[in-house]
Amino acid sequence: MKKKALLLSGLVVVALSAGMVGCGEQPSTTTSTGGDAAAVEVKEVEMSYISTADLKDNIANPEYLVLDVRKAADFEAGHIPGAVNADMDAAKDGDNESGIANMKAALGDPAKVDQKIVLVCYSGKRYAQCATNSLAVLGANMDNVYTLEGGMKAWDEAGYAVEK
């Protein structure tokens, strides 16, 4: 009986240890366009969130830049007033260089990486994560980068204004 308990305890420790190894830093994703182009290394960065109510209260505040990171067609179909599109569809599929290029184009002025940036995607997950990672590569002040909780879906469900 003691041998079984000891063996079971040992297996639990091994299983927990193996599980903890998987909880470390997220792996880097590297993408290259091939040829002599330099690879773009993108590390997964932790996201911070803003509620729909807080964004609504600050929508007219010039300190905030709202970047809608959904597909361009979905942005055109309806977006938060004043938002700028930075399509992250290619980055979501592993093309980090395109994601970074789209983010640069949406920002326009490189100094905008220091202002408060709110990322809007479909549900506040994959596209927003790609955008957060791209902003980190561009040197954004990550203390000022927020993802809209629940994404555009939550904004729509709250009944807030949308423009086309």
Describe each PLM feature range:
Residues L65-R70, A86:
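Short hydrophobic beta-strand that contains or immediately precedes a catalytic carboxylate
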